[in-house]
Amino acid sequence: MKIRIDIPHHPYDIQIEKGCMAQAGQWLRELWQPQKVVIVTDNHVASLYAEKVKLSLEDAGFQVAVFDFLEGEERKNLTTVQKVYEFLVKQGLTRSDGIVALGGGVVGDLAGFVASTYMRGIHFVQIPTSLTAQVDSSIGGKTGVNTPFAKNMVGTFAQPDGVLIDPLVLETLGKRELIEGMGEVIKYGLIEDPELWALLTGLNGSVESILEHAETLIEHSCQVKRKMVVEDELDNGIRLYLNFGHTIGHAIEATAGYGKVMHGEAVAMGMVQISKVAEEKGLMPAGITQSITEMCQKFGLPVDYENWEVDKLYQALTHDKKARGNTLKLVLVPELGSAIIHPVSLEEMKDYLVK
């Protein structure tokens, strides 16, 4: 299946197909002329797929080198970026060459940032290997790295030339790594897609049920992301809906220490906490918090952060990218399948941190 991201200045396709990673070279040959390519990945993904993708690209006429770094959210920083820059220079990459981001969200965010800043921008594509990356972070052109102050604090908007999604690679994920991606999938059902929510309701929450329906879950999620990105590429309007649960979720990730709480886990806890307080304030319908909680728990996602420290979380919130002055654009779900922006002051945001 192909989904067109029809952004006027940079349209591209998401290709979703079981087993398509084996044809990565042929796919890329349709996008780029043979040239130098650097595969950016982490050491875990490299051990599984780097050689396979490298050989496929070489068979298609590309000159390929591989850069891998130690896996983990804590490596998504400017230190790693500098190391990638140095590798690209040693390989002699020019503005006519490109980067293949092969991995999960950490790899995709970092490799995209490198591609968008090296020589003021070179071509890149995404081959996501985690559920979170396949349904969310590989699509839409947000790139970035973390700082000690906040998640993704330094970044760019830079669209890839294409996204290649192979649902079969999810079978090599660990249980926790697969389940955390469901945080984003659940979010899509809540903010835009009641049909997806109904599908999730019918699943039993097991790893087997996720893998069996992975292609459908990915397609639904990508269609929602496509709609938001095409209408609002630079995150000024409806694309903000994609941040439901992320305001508190990002604060949890930052205060826990990057890599301790996975992104989808933090999003799940963020959705539950925001909904609980918003429901108490009459801003979200009665019973929705219970529905979100039960859905997250069914798939094995955490719904309560055990190291809840209001002061630390609030400090992290002050660096949120959705803040404009002293106002933060909070995303709420007034009914299943729709979302709204609810501006709150940073002072009011303290209410949403009360357990």
Curated annotation (Swiss-Prot):
Binding site for NAD(+): 71-76, 105-109, 129-130, 142, 151
Cofactor requirement: Co(2+); Zn(2+); NAD(+)
Entry's localization field: Cytoplasm
EC code(s) of this entry: 4.2.3.4
Keyword Metal-binding found: yes
Keywords of this entry: Amino-acid biosynthesis, Aromatic amino acid biosynthesis, Cobalt, Cytoplasm, Lyase, Metal-binding, NAD, Nucleotide-binding, Zinc
Catalytically driven reaction(s): 7-phospho-2-dehydro-3-deoxy-D-arabino-heptonate = 3-dehydroquinate + phosphate
Molecular-function GO term, any one: nucleotide binding
Physiological role: Catalyzes the conversion of 3-deoxy-D-arabino-heptulosonate 7-phosphate (DAHP) to dehydroquinate (DHQ).
Family: Belongs to the sugar phosphate cyclases superfamily. Dehydroquinate synthase family.
PANTHER family assigned: 3-DEHYDROQUINATE SYNTHASE, 3-DEHYDROQUINATE SYNTHASE, CHLOROPLASTIC
Protein name: 3-dehydroquinate synthase
Source organism of the structure: Streptococcus pneumoniae (strain 70585)
Phylogenetic lineage: Bacteria, Bacillati, Bacillota, Bacilli, Lactobacillales
